[in-house]
A protein has these predicted regions:
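Adenosine-phosphate binding glycine-rich loop
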Residues: 100, 105-198
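Rossmann-like adenosine-cofactor binding region
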Residues: 40-123
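General structural feature for long, well-ordered alpha-helical segments within catalytic domains
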Residues: 6, 10, 14, 34, ...
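Short glycine- and Lys/Arg-enriched binding-loop motifs that mark or flank ligand-binding interfaces
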Residues: 2-7, 99-100, 175
Length: 198
């Protein structure tokens, strides 16, 4: 039984792979539309649960594998797997906290490394490998470069600042400019002063 918490890019990839190997998959997310899309795509191969419910807690505690893939861009993710959850799990259960680079979504989690990939807590294996894509540096570098290209192209034009300032989709990617912090999420999570673009 695989329970995946957070159904963004990583969560969806985990769901797909888990279904491909025949696992019983439960997806947990805060967004009902996301869960409905998954149910429409995978049908009876997936159970979907809204986050924060007793049903979600039960799915986490009864899983053989829990993947925490919670992402709130620019913010520390909420704790979605508690110490109490870990204590209630069967020994040998595996938890993978993919959100560790943003602070982790498992209570008390500490970053692991590729050479020391997990810790055991109450008989539960908890893996929170920081910079997980670093295991395949060439592939991850190519993917990152491909995804960054549109931003770099926009920086190379003469009036790049106006382009960012006036473009809804580009504006959030400009987080610091001339020493001013422009990201509300980063300002909140670090208790810093937020500035506005003028």
């Amino acid at each position: 039984k695989v329970t995946i918490i957070g159904c963004g890019e990583v969560g969806r990839a985990s769901i797909h792979q888990s279904i491909q190997i025949g696992a019983s998959v439960t997806a947990i997310d805060v967004n009902e539309n996301t869960l409905e899309d998954l149910k429409n795509k995978y049908g009876e191969n997936i159970s979907t649960i809204i986050s924060g419910t007793d049903e979600a807690v039960n799915a986490i505690r009864s899983a053989d594998l829990v993947i925490g893939a919670v992402l709130l861009p620019g913010r520390k993710p909420p704790v979605v797997v508690t110490e109490e959850d870990i204590s209630a799990m069967e020994q040998g259960t595996v938890i993978v906290d993919v959100a560790i680079d943003q602070g982790g979504c498992v209570e008390g989690v500490k970053p692991n490394t590729h050479s020391d990939p997990f810790e055991i807590r109450n008989g539960v294996i908890v893996s929170a490998i920081a910079n997980l894509p670093g295991a395949v540096p060439r592939t991850s570098s190519i993917e990152l470069s491909t995804n960054l290209q549109k931003y770099v192209d926009n920086l190379l034009i003469e009036n790049w600042f106006d382009k960012y300032k006036n473009n809804e989709s580009l504006r959030p990617s400009l987080q610091i400019h001339n020493g001013l912090l422009l990201s509300e999420e980063v300002a909140d999570s670090l208790s810093l002063t937020l500035s506005k673009l003028v």
